[in-house]
């Protein structure tokens, strides 16, 4: 619309002013008219307007509500003096009826039930929707109604569960598998189930029933018993293990576990996590202490044993040895897994006798050690004229405490001893050589008588041999006895002449009888002629006694032969097995 101000009109030319005045006069009759009425979405004019384009002020038009709408106010439009159509909303949307309840489902109404509204349908879990999932409130004839009727919710069903190799499920072919149905799979013997043993009928995308999860598989799975040096299996062990079997692993004392203490047999036949190891957490390689033994251990300690940190081992020196000065005689396992140091054991020496006052007849000495005389060494000695040995037999031994027993080889004066001269030859016996020494005792008319008081007669050992064959043996002379083949020595093989007596006593040689072999041989023959095992047992006892008598008789005959006496008549004790 073009507007002009009053001042502008007076500034225009006379011709323009005339034209505007004329237009004002001509337009005066239509200043209050209205144009065509508005197009309403809910109503239309009742009467046809015949393409009228202008309506005078005060014109009233009647409207009719569209289908799906109903009148709620005056349905008139008025043209006011300003040339505008005046009206209020007089038609409202009609309402569809309530759709009702959906069995095993629900109806969702987003806003309202008025015409044009859309409602949605959904089924409960495990049910499938049969029908339309939505419905629209629309005009139908002169009224309104829903475009789609209520759908139906039916329970979902699944196909029969699939079979598996080397196994079966709990269902039957004629079963109806609905939502929530469960079947359980089992494997044949010696097969292991991989996966979930049970599957469930469920719904996917609200449209189809399927089994979830996927059926399991049956396979042969074997895990071998793990080898864990210095470790062991806590609950015991088997040679083979099946899928998902668990093992608890522990380490022996002195070792620490590196890795997981619990492992499981996996589907690939391997253990998971990986098999752990047992590593030393203590000291090994026990110190080798010469001339010592470990206290509290009956058998020698083994180097593969492991001792915990802080463990202490106490050792004892062997007889003839003692701990070094200020040594605690213990070793300790330290944090660096090594043993503390020790000085060990040192040899105990016996004092050396005064060689100017004694004469050694025989001795045993260890020439490889640091001592002249050490534990186990001994000497046989005589004294110079006018004295006699401190020990009764002229023998003294070096003891473990470093002292001589009975006393250090020495001599003491004999005021009643007369001069005697006797000449004897004694063996000087050592570990490496044997020589003869001559000693002067004195002389007298009866020197031979006195000398014979110190000799020994030849020992009689039946079925045995002497290392030195003589008729008589000198005082302090020692010999060795060895038995003939088939005989065993009973007693000490080494004896020494002391005060006209052999010390220790002369041993004997006893025959080695293989009684078991002879008894078994006889028993095999007895079984052929005796009726019962009890008779055989008694017969074997009698035969064993017969063998003992026969052995004693044999020894008696040999002794008689050696002493050149008339031989005894041998008794015939033949043992008849069967008549």
From Swiss-Prot:
One of its GO terms (biological process) is binding of sperm to zona pellucida. The keyword Signal applies. This is Zona pellucida sperm-binding protein 3 receptor. GO terms for cellular component: acrosomal lumen; acrosomal matrix; acrosomal vesicle; cell body; cytoplasmic vesicle; outer acrosomal membrane; plasma membrane; zona pellucida receptor complex. Testis-specific. Not expressed in heart, liver, abdominal muscle, lung, brain or kidney. Disulfide bonds join 34-79, 65-91, 96-137, 123-153, 158-201, 187-218, 223-265, 251-278, 283-333, 317-345, 350-398, 383-411, 456-497, 483-509. It is found in: Cytoplasmic vesicle, Secretory vesicle, Acrosome lumen. Residues 1-32 form the signal peptide. Homomultimer; disulfide-linked.
């Amino acid at each position: 619309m073009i507007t002009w101000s009053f001042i502008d009109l007076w500034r225009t030319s006379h011709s323009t002013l005339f034209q505007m005045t004329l237009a004002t006069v001509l337009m005066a009759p239509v200043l209050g008219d209205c144009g065509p009425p508005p197009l309403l979405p809910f109503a239309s004019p009742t009467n046809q307007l015949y393409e009228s384009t202008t309506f005078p002020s005060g014109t009233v038009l009647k409207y009719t509500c569209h289908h799906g709408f109903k009148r709620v106010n005056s349905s008139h439009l008025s043209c006011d003096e300003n040339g505008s159509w005046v009206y209020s909303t007089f038609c409202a949307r009609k309402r569809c009826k309530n759709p009702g309840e959906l069995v095993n489902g629900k109806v969702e109404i987003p806003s309202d039930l008025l015409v044009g509204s859309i409602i949605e349908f959904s089924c409960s879990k495990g049910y499938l929707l049969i029908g339309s999932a939505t419905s629209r409130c629309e005009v139908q004839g002169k009224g309104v109604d829903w475009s789609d009727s209520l759908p139906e919710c039916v329970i979902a069903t699944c196909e029969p569960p699939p079979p598996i190799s080397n196994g079966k499920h709990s269902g039957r072919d004629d079963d109806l598998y609905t939502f929530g149905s469960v079947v359980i799979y089992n494997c044949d013997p010696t097969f292991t189930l991989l996966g979930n043993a049970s599957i469930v009928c469920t719904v996917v995308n609200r449209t189809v029933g399927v089994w979830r999860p996927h059926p399991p598989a049956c396979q042969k799975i074997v895990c071998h018993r793990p080898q864990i040096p210095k470790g062991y299996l806590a609950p015991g062990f088997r040679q083979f293990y099946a899928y998902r079997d668990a093992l608890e692993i522990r380490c022996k004392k002195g070792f620490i576990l590196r890795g997981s203490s619990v492992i499981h047999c996996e589907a690939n036949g391997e253990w998971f996590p990986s098999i752990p190891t047992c590593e030393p957490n203590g000291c090994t390689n026990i110190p080798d202490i010469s001339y010592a033994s470990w206290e509290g251990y009956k058998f020698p300690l083994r180097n593969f044993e492991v001792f915990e940190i802080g463990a202490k081992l106490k050792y004892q020196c062997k007889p003839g040895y003692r701990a070094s000065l200020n040594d605690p005689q213990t070793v300790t396992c330290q944090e660096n897994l090594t043993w503390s140091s020790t000085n060990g054991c040192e040899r105990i020496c016996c004092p050396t006798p005064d060689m100017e006052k004694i004469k050694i007849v025989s001795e045993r000495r260890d020439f490889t050690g640091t001592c002249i005389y050490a534990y186990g060494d001994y000497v046989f000695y005589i004294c110079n004229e006018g004295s006699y040995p401190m020990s009764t037999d002229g023998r003294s031994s070096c003891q473990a405490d470093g002292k001589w027993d009975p006393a250090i080889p020495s001599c003491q004066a004999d005021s009643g001893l007369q001069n005697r001269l006797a000449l004897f030859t004694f063996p000087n016996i050592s570990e490496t050589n044997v020589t003869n020494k001559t000693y002067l005792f004195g002389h007298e008319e009866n020197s031979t008588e006195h000398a014979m008081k110190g000799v020994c007669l030849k020992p009689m050992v039946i079925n045995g041999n002497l290392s030195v064959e003589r008729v008589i043996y000198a005082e302090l002379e020692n010999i060795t006895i060895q038995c003939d083949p088939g005989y065993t020595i009973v007693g000490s093989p080494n004896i020494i002449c002391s005060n006209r007596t052999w010390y220790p006593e002369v041993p004997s040689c006893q025959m080695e009888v293989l009684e078991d072999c002879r008894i078994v041989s006889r028993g095999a023959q007895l079984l052929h002629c005796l009726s019962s095992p009890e008779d055989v047992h008694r017969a074997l006892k009698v035969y064993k006694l017969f063998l003992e008598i026969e052995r004693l008789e044999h020894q008696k005959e040999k002794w008689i032969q050696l002493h050149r006496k008339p031989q005894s008549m041998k008794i015939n004790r033949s043992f008849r097995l069967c008549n």
